[in-house]
Amino acid sequence: AYQDVNFNDDGTKMYTISWYDDYIRQYTLSTGFDVSTASSSYSSLSIASQDGLTNGMTFTNNGTRLFVAGDSSNSIIEYTLSTAYDITTASHVGSTSVASQATAPESVAFNNAGTKMYVVEKSNHNVIEYDIATPFRLNSETGTVGTILRGTYGTLTLNSNGSYTYVADSSIVGLDANESVIDYFNYTVSDGTATDTAELK
């Protein structure tokens, strides 16, 4: 049985999630938001290794992160997508337990800024609100120098000399005049002897 349905920003991709087999399925729509034009074939992403009873799902505004409500694990499961809204490029980042507040989470949503997360708790029919320190980030990511780290609006590469390169996603080209967005990266680096922690934005 399908538990949730979602679309990309222009409605040309549709996603369903099923607790029966723990798969997210991605369909292409030739006409945006018209389900009668959905392709018969689909791409899929298995959530089974992270949770055995998945419910709701949501994407970040630019489609580079995916969050799934895991009923059996009482957690929110987080993925990064190297290509926006393409679940075949998804990588599991981690799972965040909400068991102490939300038993059997049924759905998950964020405010536009990604600084608040809302989880529908099935057992007692509550909506639980969480503050998020770094927008749309529930789990930290690790990597070596030169590794590309995905942000909300682009990617960051840290170099061995302490410099960095940031590449903005093409999606932000659509910003209106005088409109801006901010990406946040909290990082800790170590050379085996000393460590340093900082925030880039």
PLM features per residue range, with description:
Residues 141-201:
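Acidic, turn/loop-rich segments in luminal/extracellular domains of secretory-pathway
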Residues 26-37, 79-88, 129-138:
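Short loop/turn segments immediately following beta-strands, especially the blade-tip
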